[in-house]
């Protein structure tokens, strides 16, 4: 299936023709590099996080910052959809939970419920059954404000913290993000505090009489019924937990949070966990100036885009879900190494020199529950997140260091960092041959059936994209496909290929991202390019190319009623992924690649980069998507530089893992 989005493409550009485009993009990116060598770009989610930020401030009863609230309000109103509500991604369908939170936040800062934009949103909420039909986290937010009874929130007793590790529901069996969000939330559920809410704003008008929350529809019906029955029992016995047991469990939660507080980068370095930690300390009576509460509160502010947004300058403000400096810096370093030349390579070396001391060498994080004898050696995604290094980031940084080390006399500079990273990453391989992002063997699938997990994102099982990056890292470092760990990993990738030839992408949207990742890995692992799996993937990428020469994929491709790839207008990031995937397996001279390169050439903006409103980053399928503002800047440059290099070499072979 193809989508026509612009006029016909030009004839094939020669490498000399793309050189000015490459140089213009390179200069633009170099201008965005920080003096210490790193890059970081805005990371935007949906209306939920900015709305929650407003609600957090009013929950805590903090003085209103009218200027900031006005700018967040402007942001929320701008991204309201034509359907009357708020979506999880640009151009998406109305999401009930995001709409409830955005409406509540706007009302909190003074928007009249009778204003046209509020009336449209309210009508859409009521048409869908009202706020009672929102997801679990939204209902928790409403319960914290006294806008809903806690009986409508699935019960997660704080005593869960005292359960032995063999117990079926244990925090160590959950993904890092679920763990860090849940632990402070357990305290809130136990104490049931009520927001200060000094303006007394509620949203009674969003409820439909006699409507109750809907039961989870996905998952295993037997497990669903079991956990649903258990939830009813837990609600009934909740008032009768022994007080000393409850106090011990709360103490365990506080210890967990405080141990992982992570300075001004916050618990887990993600907004929901950080906000919950602030509310936990508040509910326990910690004053505002208490060191732990104060530093957690400052961590929230670190996520704010206050100095002008890329889209609207200083007219708007929003809160990011987290920060992405390690990821952005490593990927730009790859792009600069591909561009080559003294200036670009110097910037890449500067970036890698910034990354080197960020490596986590001394802290055994939560991952050690499954790998107690493994030495740490990974990188996080954020500025700091020592308990939660990211396998994907680690593999990407390691490959960039390996490539840079081949330049002149730099081998010794990164050798020790690479060795520790390789040791840790390989040690994190799961039993099925693949890798998860933060834990090994985190595949307790029955947990996604508990009522609390209506988001379906409680786990961190092995995924194709992360596993492909690990294969790429190992192969680029010279590990042969005959190595047992490498063979298991390649077998995992081949087994996970979809019938149409694509691969699922967990952390990027979606099948284009997964297929790019897998093709890069299989190429550097020395699978022949005429291998059936590679040929099927190449054919699939060519089949879904848009008529304008680019590629695009909608976030709806993650729908539960799986039908595969969902076409969309071409985007710079997804076009670059498709091109990098095709070029990795010998397709640099194909018509499809020529068309794609032309699309990038034609869509470069005056600054030298590319604009992209669409979301191409994956947070949690069907629940949370990300717009990486850097993706449309460095991935196209990377693809163009690789195209030029392959054309100049007149030998279309890619020797690197990405």
From Swiss-Prot:
Gene Ontology MF: a single term: lyase activity
Catalytic activity annotation: squalene = hop-22(29)-ene; squalene + H2O = hopan-22-ol
Pfam family, one: SQHop_cyclase_C
GO biological processes: triterpenoid biosynthetic process
Coiled coil: none
One GO CC annotation: plasma membrane
Positions of the catalytic residues: 392 (proton donor)
UniProt entry tagged with the keyword Lyase: yes
Function comment: Catalyzes the cyclization of squalene into hopene.
Family affiliation: Belongs to the terpene cyclase/mutase family.
Protein's name according to its UniProt entry: Squalene--hopene cyclase
Organism this protein belongs to: Zymomonas mobilis subsp. mobilis (strain ATCC 31821 / ZM4 / CP4)
Gene that this polypeptide is encoded by: shc
